[in-house]
Design a protein with these regions (language model features):
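Interfacial non-cytosolic loop connecting adjacent transmembrane helices
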Residues: 40-56, 94-118
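Alpha-helical transmembrane segments in multipass membrane proteins, preferentially the mid-helix core
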Residues: 62-74, 125-134
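Alpha-helical transmembrane segments
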Residues: 18-29, 56, 79-89, 112-122
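Hydrophobic transmembrane helix segments
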Residues: 21-63, 90
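Loop-to-transmembrane helix junctions at the membrane interface
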Residues: 66-93, 99
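Cytosolic juxtamembrane helix and N-cap/initiation of the first transmembrane helix
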Residues: 1-32, 130-142
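Juxtamembrane loop-transmembrane helix junctions in multi-pass integral membrane proteins
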Residues: 10-18, 45-52, 71-82, 104-111
Length: 142
């Protein structure tokens, strides 16, 4: 029987990175949120992932989050810290904007949809924290 080990300092597969898993959960949360908004008639298909979205982030923000997460885990050393910091800041902006865009507590939302509306920024905040952690690790060259 042989045991295969990775050399010290070797990176683990990208899909096992906590940041990647959290971003995948965020994408799923945005997808489900948009579908819930359309099925509940609180958003149209065109609004569900746009600037009028009540239960999902707009598509441009989702795209930026995906791109920055990929760069944060693909790049090495200090170069990876830049997209990780930007992702953390994007998540912060996303969470804060959720409180001021007029959608929070919208009268058209049921209690369950309002609960989902608070779940989305929570998932976004987790991604932001993990991105900040990734930035810190990357800036130290780990």
């Amino acid at each position: 029987m042989s045991i295969v080990t990775q050399p010290r300092g070797a990176s683990r597969p990208i899909t096992r990175e906590p940041l990647v898993r959290a971003v995948a959960a965020l994408i799923l949360t945005d997808l489900v949120g948009g579908l819930l908004a359309v099925s509940a008639d609180v958003n149209t298909w065109g609004e569900a992932w746009g600037s009028q979205a009540l239960l999902a982030a707009p598509l441009p923000m989702i795209g930026v989050q995906i791109l920055l997460a990929v760069l944060a885990v693909r790049l090495r050393g200090r170069k990876a810290a830049i997209p990780a910091v930007l992702l953390s800041l994007a998540c912060l902006v996303s969470v804060i904007s959720g409180f001021f865009d007029g959608g929070l507590g919208n009268d058209e939302l049921t209690t369950a949809l309002s609960a989902y509306q608070t779940f989305l920024p929570a998932v976004t905040a987790v991604v932001g924290v993990l991105a900040a952690r990734q930035a810190r690790r990357s800036s130290r060259g780990q």
